[in-house]
Amino acid sequence: TTIKSAVKSAIADVDKKDGPQEEKLIRDLANQVEGEIKERYAGPAKIEDIQNLVEHALIEDHLYDVARTYTNYRLDKDIQRAKATDVNEAVARFINNDPTLIHENANKDSNVYATQRDLLAGAVSKAAALNMLPQVVANAHMKGDIHFHDADYSPFTAQSNCSLPNFWDMLANGFTLGNAPMASPKSIAIAATQITQIMKDVASSQYGGQTANRADEHLARYAKKDYEKFLEEARETIPDGMPVEFARRQVESAKKNEPAKLHFGSREPLPMDTPFHTDVDELEQEREILAKIRTRKAIYDAMQTMEYQINSNRVSNGQTPFVTVGFGLGTDWFAREIQRAILLNRIRGLGKDHHTAIFPKLVFTIKHGVNCEPEDPNYDLKQLALECATKRMYPDVVFYENIVKITGSFKAPMGCRSFLQGWVNPETGKDEEDGRMNLGVVSVNVPRIALESHGDKDRFWKLLNERMEVAHQALQFRIMRCKEATPVNAPTLFRFGAFGRLGANDNVDQLFKNERATVSLGYIGLAETTAVFYGKNWIRDHGWDPEGKEFALSIVKRMNELCK
C-alpha cells in the first residue's frame, strides 16, 4: 500500500492523469514488486531494497519521469528518517525552538528550565530510540502504522510506565530516600508528608502515573496514632476528679470551633461525636470525644498538606507528578474521616482564590453494602463525593463489583486509566495489587489499515494481523528493555519497597515475570475504521448500524485473541 501511494504521488507530480489505466499500472507494479520481495527475501525486506525494486520497475516500464520523481520522494523520506534518528538534528530542533517539540505537552511549561532540560533529553532519547528499536518497529512507528508511546523516555532508559507503588509497605517498614533513612511515621501528618516525598522520587524513576491505592484504609492506622496521642493529652486536660459538666463544656467548646477549623463555611456542622467506648466512665468518654475532634483536625491538615505538596512538586521531567488517590471503601471512623478530609480539601480549593487542584486525581469507589444505598454506613460520604465532583470535576467514580468482574480483583487505576489484572502471588497464595506496574504501551493505527484496504475486508484482516505482529514485537522489546534495569538504577522502586525490596545485584525480572507486570496494547479510531466500510453515518443518535457494530466488536475481539 505504501508502494502504491508513493508511485501514485510520483505520477501526480509529473502531471499525468490519475485514471483507471494509471490505477491498473500502479496495482500491477506494486504486485510485481511484492512478488519479487517474496522470492528474494525470507523475512522482512529493508526499505532501501524495496525502493530499489520500485525504481527498477518504473524504469523497465519506461516511466522515466515518474522514476525520477519517485527517486526524489525516496530521497526526501531517507532524509526524514535520517533526521529522526540523528541526535544532532534533535538538539538543533530544540535550539531553534521547533514548536512541535517545545509545545508537545500541555502539562509542561516550556519556559521553565527544568522543562527545557527534559525536552532536550526527550528529543535526544527519541532520536536514539529509533536506532535502538527493531527496524520493523522503528519503521512502523515513523510511518504511523503503530505508535511506540513515550519514546522520549523509553527505550533509551529502562524505565517502566505506570504503577501502584507499595507506599504502605514503605511506611510500615521504613525506607531510604536519598541520604535519609526514614522510620515508620507516628502521625497522619508525617505519613502524608512521606508519601508525597516517595511520590516525587517514583515520578522521577518512571514515566507513567502512580496511584495510592485504597489510601483511606491504609492511612487509617497513622490517624489512629494521632488519636492515641490526643487521648493522652485529653487525660491531662480532663483529669480524674474534674466535674463531668466542666469536662463536657470543654468538649462542646472544641466542637463549636470545629467548623471554622475545617473551613466549613456555610456547610452544616457535623453532629456531636460519640465515644468509642460506652463501658468506661463519663470522664473517659468525654476524653475520647475530645480526642476524636482533635484527630479530625489533624487528618484534615494532613490531607491538605498532601494536596499542596503534590501540586507544588516538580520532578525531573519538568512537571507535577501524575498522582492518583484511590479511596472510598474504609468504614472505620479513621478511614471515614480521611475520606471526608480529602473531599473537603478538594472542594475548598487551593490558595486564597480557591483554585481547583489539578492533582492528585481522585478516584472514589462505590460498593454495595458500603456506600451505595441510603442505609449503607458510608452513604453520606458518597453524597459528599458527588458534591465534590459537581464542583471540582473530581473524584471520578468507579464501581467495586464491576472492576472485580472485569479484572478479577479490586484496585484503583494506575495513574490515569490503566488497570492491572487480578494476580495471586504464588508464594503467598494471596491477591496482590500494590507494588505492581505496567512496562509500556504500543498502539495500532486501525483507520490507516481500513484506508489501505480500499473496502476489501479480507485485505483488512490480513493487514491487521501484520500490524499486530509488529506491535507484538514492539511490546516484547519493551519487556526486554525493562528487564535490563538494575536495582541501583531506581532504589526507591526496586530496593526500598515501592516495587519490592531487592538486593543491589538482584535481577529485577523477578518483579515482572509470571504476569506480575503488564504491557498494554492500544488502538485508535474504531469508529472511523467502521465508517470506511459502513459509511460515516453508521453511528446515529441513540443507535448504530448492527452490522457496523458487529464489525467494530470483531476488531477488538481479534486483538484480544492475539493478545491471549
Predicted regions and their residues:
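Short intrinsically disordered, low-complexity coil segments enriched in acidic
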Residues: 1-12, 523, 548-552, 564
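Charged, amphipathic alpha-helical regulatory modules used
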Residues: 1-97
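Amphipathic, well-packed alpha-helical segments that form the structural scaffold of globular domains
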Residues: 8, 34, 472, 476, ...
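Generic structural signal for hydrophobic core residues of well-folded globular domains
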Residues: 37, 57-61, 219-222, 346, ...
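Short, conserved catalytic/metal-binding motifs centered on acidic residues
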Residues: 54, 325, 526
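Conserved catalytic cores of very large enzyme subunits
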Residues: 76-80, 84-516, 536, 542-564
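Contiguous, well-ordered alpha-helical segments that form the cores/surfaces of helical PPI scaffolds
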Residues: 519-532, 557
